[in-house]
């Protein structure tokens, strides 16, 4: 089956960040795109404005009339429950039904695919790489797991000879890809609800590395043989060094296997983003992208929404970040401390998933203890049911701070207003993003 032969593409879970990139791709090649999601969001509103027909009630009567088993591909995410009426309607009536990861694998397998994997950093790294290739006018489509600020989109469309795909370890989705090149930014344990043991996560990354056809690029220190390494001051194959801060931004030189680049500048804050930039630079250099184009792209990449987005008003600094794993929290807090030494930092954290909170409770406690004060929100369940005893009050006991409280999301802004802080940091992967705009409005008025 040629996946591009259908007329209609119907998405169950249409508001998901990975799903919507596929919707935009099919729309861009002239296909009819429709779908369902349980929640109306800013993203679904944008998709509807782009001509994608989305409804928000699980009701087979709302499926567009022209859809039939011959002309339609149905795409769903693993988060969709087994008793979903529309999904079962399509299964019973012999529609072709595929997971998002399978579809991404089919779209990219006939291209020169570059997979970007890793427990942390893959969205930013794939977005930077997609931007470099766009600036260099390489015929490439990049499927992203976040909204790249330069394009206000989670897809960069510029031809289909090459593809960049965020290679997600959840549900072992990345094993559906056929990458010629790949980056692995990290292999930390996560998704233990899927993998069970921490070693199983690392084993899965080894399986991904084994399917890379041409060359693998990994952060220096990761256990992958035969790969190019990258890092910052790590004497890696691609190594950033002579790091300095000019006008508030990182500037550095990069040693490569065959030469060097000097005075490379990035706009993104944080040591981890310097590493992400070097990873993307390494692949672009290997692909033969001219160094002046690489430097131009890195100096103009603005960032990804909810990846350390900064806002300043009336003497207060506000940063919003997607961090939802202890390693990511450490990176975000480290970046705040680097940028704003001596400032009082208030963190607002929404734990994501009961299983992740349980499995990494000690690490979360240590990470959050690096703040000056903490508002800990209720756990965002996503696809999970509650686990007895695993609550935000339980997690709060593991945080070594004098100033700490638990709050509902609804009461969070009122609680923030009562706090004394110089820097406010909101972090989490659930629906904490719904308070970002109200916080900015309040800070602007204060």
Name what the model sees in each region.
Residues 36-37, 55-60, 98-102, 143-146, ...:
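Beta-strand->loop->alpha-helix junctions that form or flank phosphate-binding loops
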Residues 1-99, 103, 239-241, 261, ...:
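N-terminal leader/targeting and accessory segments in enzymes
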Residues 4-5, 25-31, 48, 62-69, ...:
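Phosphate-binding loop of NTP-binding sites
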Residues 71, 411-442:
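A glycine-rich beta-strand to alpha-helix segment
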Residues 365-422:
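C-terminal helical cap/extension that packs against the catalytic core
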Residues 31-38, 215-220, 346-349, 371-381:
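Short internal beta-strands
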Residues 2-8, 18, 25, 29, ...:
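Nucleotide phosphate-binding/pyrophosphate-handling subdomain across enzymes
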């Amino acid at each position: 089956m040629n996946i591009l032969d259908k007329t209609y593409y119907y998405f169950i879970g249409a508001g998901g960040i990975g799903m919507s990139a596929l919707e935009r791709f099919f729309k861009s090649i002239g296909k009819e795109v429709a779908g369902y999601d349980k929640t109306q969001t800013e993203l679904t509103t944008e998709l509807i404005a782009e001509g994608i027909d989305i409804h928000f009630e699980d009701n087979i009567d709302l499926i567009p009339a022209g859809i039939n088993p011959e002309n339609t591909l149905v795409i769903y995410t693993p988060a969709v429950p087994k008793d979903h009426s529309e999904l079962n309607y399509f299964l019973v009536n012999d529609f072709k039904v595929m997971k998002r990861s399978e579809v991404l694998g089919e779209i990219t397998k006939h291209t020169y695919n570059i997979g970007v994997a890793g427990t942390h950093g893959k969205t930013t790294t794939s977005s930077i790489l997609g931007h470099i290739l766009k600036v260099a006018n390489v015929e490439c489509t990049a499927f992203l797991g976040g909204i790249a600020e330069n394009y206000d989109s989670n897809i960069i469309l510029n031809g289909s000879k090459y593809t960049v795909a965020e290679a997600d370890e959840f549900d072992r989705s990345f094993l559906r890809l056929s990458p010629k090149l790949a980056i692995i930014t990290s292999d930390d344990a996560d998704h233990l609800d899927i993998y069970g043991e921490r070693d199983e996560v690392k084993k899965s990354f080894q399986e991904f590395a084994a399917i890379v056809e041409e060359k693998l690029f990994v952060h220096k220190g990761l256990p992958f043989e035969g790969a190019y390494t990258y890092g910052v001051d790590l004497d890696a194959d691609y190594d950033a060094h002579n790091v300095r801060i000019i006008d508030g931004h990182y500037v550095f030189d990069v040693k490569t296997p065959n030469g060097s680049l000097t005075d490379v500048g990035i706009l993104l804050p944080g040591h981890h983003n310097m590493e992400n930039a070097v990873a993307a630079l390494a692949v672009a250099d290997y692909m033969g992208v001219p160094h002046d184009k690489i430097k131009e792209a890195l100096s103009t990449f603005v960032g990804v929404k909810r990846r350390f987005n900064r806002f300043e008003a009336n003497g207060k600094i506000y940063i919003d970040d997607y961090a939802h794993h202890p390693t990511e929290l450490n990176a975000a807090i480290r970046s705040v401390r680097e940028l704003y030494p001596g400032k009082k930092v208030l963190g607002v954290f929404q734990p994501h998933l009961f299983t992740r909170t349980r499995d990494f409770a000690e690490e979360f406690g240590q990470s959050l203890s690096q703040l000056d004060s903490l508002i800990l929100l209720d756990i965002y369940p996503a696809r999970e049911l509650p686990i007895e005893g695993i609550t935000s009050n339980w997690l709060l006991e593991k945080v070594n701070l004098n100033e700490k409280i638990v709050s509902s999301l609804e009461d969070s802004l009122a609680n923030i207003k009562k706090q004394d802080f110089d820097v406010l940091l909101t972090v989490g992967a659930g629906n904490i993003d719904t308070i970002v705009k109200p916080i900015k409005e309040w800070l602007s008025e204060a």
